[in-house]
Amino acid sequence: MAGAQPGVHALQLKPVCVSDSLKKGTKFVKWDDDSTIVTPIILRTDPQGFFFYWTDQNKETELLDLSLVKDARCGRHAKAPKDPKLRELLDVGNIGRLEQRMITVVYGPDLVNISHLNLVAFQEEVAKEWTNEVFSLATNLLAQNMSRDAFLEKAYTKLKLQVTPEGRIPLKNIYRLFSADRKRVETALEACSLPSSRNDSIPQEDFTPEVYRVFLNNLCPRPEIDNIFSEFGAKSKPYLTVDQMMDFINLKQRDPRLNEILYPPLKQEQVQVLIEKYEPNNSLARKGQISVDGFMRYLSGEENGVVSPEKLDLNEDMSQPLSHYFINSSHNTYLTAGQLAGNSSVEMYRQVLLSGCRCVELDCWKGRTAEEEPVITHGFTMTTEISFKEVIEAIAECAFKTSPFPILLSFENHVDSPKQQAKMAEYCRLIFGDALLMEPLEKYPLESGVPLPSPMDLMYKILVKNKKKSHKSSEGSGKKKLSEQASNTYSDSSSMFEPSSPGAGEADTESDDDDDDDDCKKSSMDEGTAGSEAMATEEMSNLVNYIQPVKFESFEISKKRNKSFEMSSFVETKGLEQLTKSPVEFVEYNKMQLSRIYPKGTRVDSSNYMPQLFWNAGCQMVALNFQTMDLAMQINMGMYEYNGKSGYRLKPEFMRRPDKHFDPFTEGIVDGIVANTLSVKIISGQFLSDKKVGTYVEVDMFGLPVDTRRKAFKTKTSQGNAVNPVWEEEPIVFKKVVLPTLACLRIAVYEEGGKFIGHRILPVQAIRPGYHYICLRNERNQPLTLPAVFVYIEVKDYVPDTYADVIEALSNPIRYVNLMEQRAKQLAALTLEDEEEVKKEADPGETPSEAPSEARTTPAENGVNHTTTLTPKPPSQALHSQPAPGSVKAPAKTEDLIQSVLTEVEAQTIEELKQQKSFVKLQKKHYKEMKDLVKRHHKKTTDLIKEHTTKYNEIQNDYLRRRAALEKSAKKDSKKKSEPSSPDHGSSTIEQDLAALDAEMTQKLIDLKDKQQQQLLNLRQEQYYSEKYQKREHIKLLIQKLTDVAEECQNNQLKKLKEICEKEKKELKKKMDKKRQEKITEAKSKDKSQMEEEKTEMIRSYIQEVVQYIKRLEEAQSKRQEKLVEKHKEIRQQILDEKPKLQVELEQEYQDKFKRLPLEILEFVQEAMKGKISEDSNHGSAPLSLSSDPGKVNHKTPSSEELGGDIPGKEFDTPL
């Protein structure tokens, strides 16, 4: 799956599966660090994999939600007790060493606040099994994206597990779980005939799943779903039929952006399967009917998730260069809080990697202990130090537990001790082992113009980003160069975008990540220390290959160097500056090279910038403070939740293709990118808060600047109802999402005071349209069990307003035509009045046939004529009504001039369309397919007849041999008859044997005949079925091809018509200009003053005439186009009408053939029998022979006339 290509994705995600050993439970010993008491427990997992739970000796049950579990470790990676007494108590197993039986389950609400469940198994194999199973359950992507129904089942499971020692469910747990409205809970319990006192408890068998559903329906009634149910056909009957349900799913729930061939709409039988799955009433389900209860279950079921499971799976192409991906990246990974006084933690590296991060930062400093061990800390601050070696071990432990794709280690190396740098390099080599990429891959040498390897090429590899030194010069000059480089490296951050000093080598260093701290860091640096760095730096430098940091100079220089293995880091302010000044160049840079963005130094509270800013420019490593779960981090987690949570997301195509340029500040549609229109209607909420408060919902969109809309929509606040508020407000419409592949929708819920409840971030490209539950998550991206929002989403390809009518007409032509007819009727009265006015105003000498031509309609819009309500006067009448002194009147029949330039354009007929090359080619292909099919069946028939002929010959030969033996025996007997002592009864015995033989052979031949007849019938029926099916498919393909050909030809004709219109205008202007010149020539014969006056008037009149004539011509051209478009529609409709006719004819043809077939086969067999019997009787034998000529079964290859001809020049007539 690593190299997944576009197309239909085969889902690889495995559903949750809990092993029997986890369900049955296993004995463990539980211990804590802060106590010397050990507790024997039985640890279990519920069958759905929602919870860990254990009972101790007092039969008290404790739960651990598996969605909170981050990791499961055993053996040397598990926590070990430090107290010797505790260790002695735990060493109770008799199979395996204690270290190998240790299990640590790491859990917590976020990456910082984590806890440990420490266990000891009695056997090593048990420890390994439980560790693997628990980690698998905790990291299951389908479990992290459960359906609404699964979350409600999880709440039910929790109630069933938290029972009293007597096995009863305490009602206080139900009140605690649904605490928003105690009165409602009480009423709902009473509706289920259950006790309602908080101090009561109920037997588990009384609180079945069915009772739980009834309880929920009473607690949280859903009138909005009843309305939807009624809207789709359940108005008079309490159910939807299978056809109505199919329409609902295909019209409302299906994504219109999907290809209908690759992702066809659901068929009736598929919908029936869904009905049988969700309808609780079996009798209704068998009839293909679904009740409102079943409908509600479907809406909350796994098939109706708001995001397709395929998007959660690893579904993107992972074989492109590393620079073509967004890479989940962390800044100052070791910190657990602020930048100045926060604690550093080795565990943060584990948690960050387990969460899907693929790029971590190591801020390395010189250790000041006697052991001279390098440390990781935030220099010149109050943050604590942690061991560099322990960090490397933690990275090695968790690097590939959740993703197999490469890890990038971003070293910020401040260690000025050669010895300690040598230790750092040694630790990397020894601890990472083969996972550390020491040398570049053979296919991707470190050369100019060579792209970076892909994530698939680098699977299970660790890459180091550290300063790379050049070693080409001598030792003396090398020291000088290193000194210069060190000076450059630790200069002020503004130097990052200035040209490098002449002393800097080709492999210059990047500006350090924390340039804002450089002033204070620089005081600890001096030339001698930097000069002594050479050998130690080489130790670390040898680890660097594909990620070589260099100081950024300019996009032009980077493009000229064209070295993909060089990368630069930008503090957010400088990155923003580059994005503002050179957005297109920044995107181009990121196509070939990597860039890393990190937060500015003034973010001492570890807040984050919005990563979307830099994703828009194609920056790969947009590093954030993972310890701070602000909105920026939430968007980051939403981004990397998809594509298998691999930590890599393929950039949009325009950010990868070298032949395309992309401006992230574009406001219009980008050629080649299909924009989307997204509409979100917030309908209702369920169990939004555990308090009786008002709630509201906000909707945001993040993406390109043109797509981003913060707080685009906010519902009204529900009045004291957090259980089932219903809003039913007008939807928020994001009319044009220019780059949907990089846009995400955020739906957030707040209490009336503004307190955050939960949210969900959804990629626009992954959103499924229709009615869906959006199960909310908290600010740490942990799923909330009960809170959900019910929405209706519409998502489709964006259509500009100018083409909206065209799309409407194409998608629903019948409704559109009816609407046009309705409008025409409404305007009919006014139109008739206008026509009468025009007739009255027409010239007296005008013929009746000419008058109506003056009444005009507006130009056709989308191929449908809209009759105007007010018809302006024709140009000729306008000129007559206001004659100017000395002006030349336009001719009465203005149409003559216009008609003289108009060209007749006829729509191509169906017969002409059939002559098109692509259509003829398809017909020839179909002819060949039919010919091959008939040949195959002809061969089968021939083989069958040969087989029967062989059998007949065997029967005949056997018959002749046995008859000859009997006759020979008869002759011997006749000789014996002549002897006097011989008895006379032998003659009668021979005759009886011969008669029996004839009867036996006749029966065999009859059986053979019957068998042949049946087999020939079956074979011919098989042929007819194949022919019929193939012809039916051919009809579909030919109709589709003819429709495509018609559309293509008609579009070409309309394009050509535009050219013709332009030519006609030029021709009209030319003719009118010629007339003007003639009038000017006539005026020259008059005196000069009169001539000048007339000339001026003629020019003024000419301008008016040209304007009017051009207007009339455009109207005439518009009418012509309308007629042509209408004719095009008629032809396309005629083509579509052909399909049912041809299908009916085909059905009739083969019905007749099937009816005649048994008689034809019978006649053939009988005729063959008669011919062979007469032939054999001439040779003294009676048996039937079977003809070996298949042509007698009317099974010859069809002639070219039958299949439509085989002459290339001839038009094929079958099926069209």
Curated annotation (Swiss-Prot):
Domain PI-PLC X-box: start-end pairs: 316-467
Gene3D superfamilies cross-referenced by the UniProt entry: 2.30.29.240, C2 domain, EF-hand, Phosphatidylinositol (PI) phosphodiesterase, Phospholipase C beta, distal C-terminal domain
Modification after translation, per record: Palmitoylated. Palmitoylation at Cys-17 by ZDHHC21 regulates the signaling activity of PLCB1 and the function of the endothelial barrier. Palmitoylation by ZDHHC21 is stimulated by inflammation.
Keyword entries, A-Z: Calcium, Cytoplasm, Epilepsy, Hydrolase, Lipid degradation, Lipid metabolism, Lipoprotein, Membrane, Nucleus, Palmitate, Phosphoprotein, Transducer
PI-PLC Y-box domain ranges (all copies): 540-656
Residue positions bearing lipid (S-palmitoyl cysteine): C17
Active-site annotation: H331, H378
Domain C2: start-end pairs: 656-786
SUPFAM superfamilies, sorted: C-terminal domain of PLC-beta (SSF69989), C2 domain (Calcium/lipid-binding domain, CaLB) (SSF49562), EF-hand (SSF47473), PH domain-like (SSF50729), PLC-like phosphodiesterases (SSF51695)
Catalytic activity, EC: 3.1.4.11
Skewed-composition ranges (Acidic residues): 507-518
Basic and acidic residues bias locations: 472-483, 963-979, 1075-1095
One Pfam short name: PI-PLC-Y
CDD domains: C2_PLC_like, EFh_PI-PLCbeta1, PH_PLC_beta, PI-PLCc_beta
Superkingdom of the source species: Eukaryota
PROSITE patterns cross-referenced by the UniProt entry: C2, PIPLC_X_DOMAIN, PIPLC_Y_DOMAIN
Ranges where the record places region Disordered: 469-534, 834-891, 963-994, 1071-1095, 1173-1216
Record localization: Nucleus membrane; Cytoplasm
Function: Catalyzes the hydrolysis of 1-phosphatidylinositol 4,5-bisphosphate into diacylglycerol (DAG) and inositol 1,4,5-trisphosphate (IP3) and mediates intracellular signaling downstream of G protein-coupled receptors. Regulates the function of the endothelial barrier.
Clinical disorder: Developmental and epileptic encephalopathy 12: A form of epilepsy characterized by frequent tonic seizures or spasms beginning in infancy with a specific EEG finding of suppression-burst patterns, characterized by high-voltage bursts alternating with almost flat suppression phases. Patients may progress to West syndrome, which is characterized by tonic spasms with clustering, arrest of psychomotor development, and hypsarrhythmia on EEG.
Subunit structure comment from the entry: Interacts with DGKQ.
Protein name in UniProt: 1-phosphatidylinositol 4,5-bisphosphate phosphodiesterase beta-1
Source organism (scientific name): Homo sapiens
Gene coding for it: PLCB1
